[in-house]
Every structure is written in C-alpha cells, then in structure tokens.
C-alpha cells in the first residue's frame, strides 16, 4: 500500500512541476496486480504488460491466438488517461517468469538455440536472432504489437534487426 501511495504523491508532484510528463511502471506481475500501479488513474499513466510478451511469441510459433487472447481476457482495462505498455523484448531478456513451467519448457525448446542466451528463467536474445532472422516473423510480431490496445514499445536495435552479443 505504501508503494501505491508514494506513486500517487510522485505523480501529483510531477504533474505540478512538469506537466505532460508520463510515469511508466516496470512491474513484472500478473495484469490484475500490475494494474494497481495505475492507481485508478492517479498513479502511473503507463504500466508494462509483462505476461503478454512471451505469449505473443507462443502464439506466433503455435499459429494460435489462444495465448494472447487468454492473457488479454485476464487484463483489467486501464483507467481513463492510462495505457498498458506492450513490448516484444526488453533490455534484459525475453522474460519467462509469467508463464507456466510447461510453457517455459516450450519456449526454451523453441527459442533457446544457443545455451549462452539463457538468463535466469528467460532468454537473452535480440528480436531478429530470436526469430531465426526470419523477416516475415519479425514483421508479423510487430504488426501484432502495433494492433493491440496499448502503447507499443520498441527496444532499441530491434527496428534494424540488430544481432546478439552475449558478452555485453
């Protein structure tokens, strides 16, 4: 509770001193829990939707809308003036904390082609190499990202098909 009260006070002060600025919450949680960072519209204006990220990859490879549709059904609507931040990757990894063990095993079998790319529970790869440098898959995932309700976030380098460097 203190976190959310702090965020609402921070938002009030940011709005007062720096109007037009946006607070973005990076909360790797289930949608119903992450939605608390919106604070009924008085907290962060944008909250990352972590559970959606791996499900977009699953849907692509399975050729099935179910992984995406299921998590969107569990996602509360953002309050007025707020949005979910949607993304295909972030600066760390394709995080697999918000999937079942079975789904994680599937993702590892499908996308973990280089053992150096394993990071914690996830996969540390850039978008293009993660998808086997298949342009059609990269484009399809980006179309999906841009068509879902929310704010699409593109991680730098993904727009040009940047490759991996596991030593950075």
Segments from the language model and where they lie:
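Active-site and adjacent substrate-binding regions of carbohydrate-active enzymes
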Residues: 1-168
